């Protein structure tokens, strides 16, 4: 499975739950996709799997939202406002060193500054209708531990 068809917000959250449940800590997840593709919906599923009770909101205006009260910390980041790639306001090495899960939306703006060890999901709309929840999610695992992580995620969809 290098791609997965998603037909509803519930299925997107199910994928998020699979990601969260199979996370081992010190994980880096990159989420690519247009506005409204489902990146935050996916992250809500991750938070549920990590037993985070607070509502998950898009970090578009805050850049980073921290959720530390679950089974492991979740750091939800949105790099859309960092088009210049200036990470000086974010302690990225500190977040990556924690035993948590770092989720980065719009990673293309900072990809050169990230370790070459991550799982990337590219979320694409199947059609142009804003009402449609149909998506294709493509997976790319970089590094051996992320290939193992992806194989664990796939088990939830066999």
Name each region found by the language model.
Residues 19-26:
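Phosphate-binding P-loop
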Residues 60, 66-108:
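Conserved nucleotide-sensing/catalytic segment adjacent to the nucleotide-binding pocket
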Residues 39:
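Conserved lysine of the Walker
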Residues 28-30:
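Short hydrophobic/aromatic beta-strand immediately N-terminal to the Walker A/P-loop
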Residues 1-18:
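N-terminal pre-Walker A segment at the start of P-loop NTPase domains
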Residues 2, 93-158:
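Short phosphate-coordinating micro-motif centered on Lys-Gly-acidic
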Residues 32-34:
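P-loop (Walker A) phosphate-binding loop of NTP-binding proteins
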Residues 48-58, 69-72:
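Post-Walker A helix-loop "phosphate-sensing" segment adjacent to the P-loop in P-loop NTPases
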